[in-house]
Amino acid sequence: TDLIGVPIKMVEAVSQTIEKQHGIPRKSLMFTCSHTHCGPALDHMLSFMLDMQEADWDQVRAYQQVLNAKVIQVINAALADLKPAQLSTGNGNCQFAANRRAPKGLGPYDHQVPVLKIASPEGKLRGLVFGYACHNTTLSFYQWCGDYAGFAQLDLEGGHEDIVAMFH
């Protein structure tokens, strides 16, 4: 999920393939990302902001094809491993977000961390989907990184055996 966004052309290409392979319509798929500003450039995504040569865009388009194929692979793997699950929700709390337009705690902010928990019928944790209302711009370098959301995912996965954590 370490992308700044999901280009509509990617959504269309992946959705068409999944519908063709499995009969699952686009409206039944959810595409999400962490909106990290340390993610890769994608085709048809903020190109007006990037001063890149055509050879660079060729690399971006090649990467986009690889990414599309990997997303399709992940969806296929998930569909091949469908199991009954229990879903539950909760809210955590985190205190580092701030309103950049009204700093010093004066502006509106949301410190809640909504969580969707996915567990087996026996209660074994299988996955977590969570969010936080804070822009993924805490880092300031040009290397691929999930920013704070990516580190949170790694921490959650490291603390639990065989789970997938996703920031939304």
What is each of the regions a protein language model found here?
Residues 1-168:
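Conserved beta-alpha junction segments in alpha/beta enzyme cores
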